[in-house]
Amino acid sequence: MNLHEYQAKQIFAQYRLPVSKGIVCHSLDDAVSAIHTLAGDTWAAKCQVHAGGRGKAGGVKLVRSEAEIREFCNQWLGQRLVTFQTDKNGQPVNTIYLEETCLIERELYLGAVIDRSSQKIVFMASNAGGMNIEDVAAQTPELIHKATIDPLTGAQAFQGRELAFKLGLSGDQIKQFAHLFVQLAKLFIEKDLALLEVNPLVLTKQGQLLCLDAKMVIDSNALYRHPELKALQDPSQEDAREADAAKWDLNYVALDGNIGCMVNGAGLAMGTMDIVKLHGGRPANFLDVGGGATKERVSEAFKLILSDQNVKAVLVNIFGGIVRCDLIAEGIIAAVNEVGINIPVIVRLEGTNAELGREILANSGLRLIAANTLTQAAQLAVKAAEGK
């Protein structure tokens, strides 16, 4: 689950991490009032959306007067912000965060993720702050310095000092960085995070480190023990179809293609998408109905796919290990009868009760296209989506 920048910074403050003073604005009146409360004569106005690239898209701007903040709010509040991380529709801007500014000497990067190979938290620091860290890692990997957190001992101050030295910090800056490093690691563990990012972490002209931006992604599987974080969830930033899928324990991710995919098992779902792409098609979604799929869940999954107006064909690829192919077949028939369908549906069934499943589909009287192999299914789906 993603948090907004202002929410992450509120949590940062609880952990004694340095952040600028800011005010959350839900309306134009809030913003006008905020600039008379905040110090200074220049403020940063930031659209609050669950996506990066806000600055390049015009969603972050320095404002110096009431007229400028009015213009910014009128431009964005109630509108949608499109960045390189969103789809073509963008994300709704319901909130603007207005905060005090500072004079910047240097921009750094500091982030943490779970390294699955070592099963430990890995911190990454770089002098290339304010940039896309993926680009830095690909083009100049030598600029990224790492520190691994042992889960038994936790983050140690000496690790923070080592990173500070590598970043070229000196004097009191090293002490500041070590404190920041230890507190961020504590936050990461206590809040069950999947990702934590401060980009940029700035060194001000006064020699102080300041978290100018904050990104937190919480492990959704751990939300049951963090009701205070669950309460921060913003449904408006989530795809409505993905939210509906979660109600049925379906793993769904919307994409921008035109071939709907329904598969059981995450690995098989990824492989299905790959082979569709290999044959020139574009998957419209990732959808894993899971190993314990019921007829009702399959029916809901099918309706979910058909709710996407871009879908021109549907590919159902089921390998019956835990799930039975005859149940999948009944779910498909129920969904088609309930929703109605005028696009081609290609079905490939293998495994437990596959023959029975194919027989049920064949006797349904519906216009379903049977495929014997995954390759054949992908080829048929691509042709069907192209209207051939």
Curated annotation (Swiss-Prot):
Binding positions (ATP): K46, G53, R54, G55, E99, C102, E107
EC number, as in UniProt: 6.2.1.5
Binding site for substrate: N264, G321, I322, V323
Biological process, per Gene Ontology: succinyl-CoA metabolic process; tricarboxylic acid cycle
PROSITE patterns assigned: SUCCINYL_COA_LIG_3
Comment on bound cofactor: Binds 1 Mg(2+) ion per subunit.
Residues binding Mg(2+): N199, D213
Keywords, comma-separated and alphabetical: ATP-binding, Ligase, Magnesium, Metal-binding, Nucleotide-binding, Tricarboxylic acid cycle
Subunit structure: Heterotetramer of two alpha and two beta subunits.
Family: Belongs to the succinate/malate CoA ligase beta subunit family.
Name this protein carries in UniProt: Succinate--CoA ligase [ADP-forming] subunit beta
Organism encoding this protein: Actinobacillus pleuropneumoniae serotype 5b (strain L20)
